[in-house]
Amino acid sequence: MRATIITAIIFFISLTGYTQAPTKVLNFKGRLFEISLKNNAEKILKTGTVKVFQDKSLCVFIEATHFGVYDFLLPLGHRYTLEFSGENMVSKKIEIDARRCPENLEKTAVDFDVVLFAKAAEIQFNSLNAPIAKYTWDPRIGILLNDDDYSFDQTKALKKEVRKAKKAITLAEK
């Protein structure tokens, strides 16, 4: 009887400790949009997906809601690549390095609204083979910080490719 009570107490204490432990996660959330290369009209992407690669291995696959919303949790201590895509759309990637996030960080929200566009015939968007943005933990200010120089260069290359795609679309319509 005494052994049963002790076992029950140990089980209860370990269960209580487990449920009250800090989550130590990043909460990724946002919306997916699509933009027309013809007229720049923007609307919610209704069939979008998010693939999450943890240390280069696929760990999460999420379909956005019909409002383009996605929301998921990822543990700290890893490098992630988030790949946003949709049917007949180009894919965009964002790299998150959460390896240096502090152990006492319990939960933090990371908001990304991502705009995708339809694939254009015979136009290669080579700039999208690499992540469009890279984030890493900055201990000085206590947040995930974007590498602005990298993002500027990637955005510049993508804008150049988008201009070519728009010209090709305009020529094809004539």
Where are these regions (language model features)?
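Short, acidic Ser/Thr/Gly-rich low-complexity loop/linker segments typical of extracellular
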Residues: K56-V69
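Conserved, compact domain cores that house catalytic/ligand-binding motifs in diverse enzymes
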Residues: P131-K174
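Extracellular beta-sheet/turn segments enriched in Thr/Pro/Gly and aliphatic residues
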Residues: R99-P139, L145
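Short, ordered, surface-exposed loop/turn motifs in non-cytosolic proteins
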Residues: F28, L37-Q54, T136-I143
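Beta-strand-rich domain onsets/edges
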Residues: T16-N27, F33-E34, S127
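Short Pro-Gly-centered beta-turn/loop motif in secreted/extracellular proteins
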Residues: D71-T81, E87
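A short, solvent-exposed loop/turn motif at the edges and junctions
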Residues: E83-R99
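Sec-dependent N-terminal signal peptides
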Residues: T4-L15
